[in-house]
Amino acid sequence: MIPSFGIGRQAPQDRVDEWIAAVAPGRSFVDIGGIGEQSGNERCSWAQRCGAVNVAMADILPLNDDLWEYFLGTMRARGVTNIDVRPGVDVDDPGLATKLGRFDIVQATGLLYHLPNPVHSLLNLRRVVGEYLITNTVVIPDLVENAEGRIAFPAASALFLPALRGRERAVLRRHYLDRFSVDLDFHAPMGDGAMMPYVIKGEPSPWPYWWFFTKSAFERALEMLEMRVLDRYTWQDHAHFVFLRRN
């Protein structure tokens, strides 16, 4: 059966797929971080179907991780071949450009809110972008109101989740549980003993949620890349996607 979503799909599943289809023919392509969540958001197979060449999947995880095994196994099962594999790629690595090289199209979504220094991460990503960058982050609404209370976020806001406590935490936890079945007590833990702690062996972890931005604050950060915004879209006032081109 031909899947309508995920690896091997034959039609665009969202706006990001449409962006890729518009520029993929004859261009190199890398998807950074696309093996997560059962590879449901991977873009390699779609980019290849749309005519991209030198297509690669990169991720911070080592090749022996279960997520790589699932990704590669599903690729084989669905007849997708000739995808280059780049394990152990950290977007915060000062040597990223040397390790990964440059691709015409860089797709890096689902990453920035997991990183402790997202502006640094964006600037580092720019070093591997030949022409186009597709990225996103989780955004906070201007106003959140529910049974736990009410919080307004000024346009320039960036929310540091390790510091989230008290009423603000209660309001936002209820918001994300009700709308997306996401529990901030798991993804943005408060104390010791968490399954995804913020610091592991003295180093920041890339697994919990670190930062949420307002849409305007995120786009202001993107301006630092000195790239031109071609298009944008927001999914359910929650995930903000931006399609950029180098000047």
Predicted regions and their residues:
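Conserved alpha-helix/loop element of class I SAM-dependent methyltransferases that forms part
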Residues: 6-27, 42, 46
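Short amphipathic alpha-helix with an adjacent loop that forms part of the alpha/beta core around
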Residues: 19-22, 93-101
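Conserved class I S-adenosyl-L-methionine
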Residues: 26-38
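Conserved SAM-binding loop of SAM-dependent methyltransferases across substrates and taxa
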Residues: 36-52
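Conserved SAM-binding motif I beta-strand of class I
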Residues: 54-62
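S-adenosyl-L-methionine
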Residues: 69-98
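A short SAM/SAH-binding and catalytic strip from SAM-dependent methyltransferases
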Residues: 103-117
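S-adenosyl-L-methionine-dependent methyltransferase catalytic module, highlighting the catalytic core
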Residues: 116-246
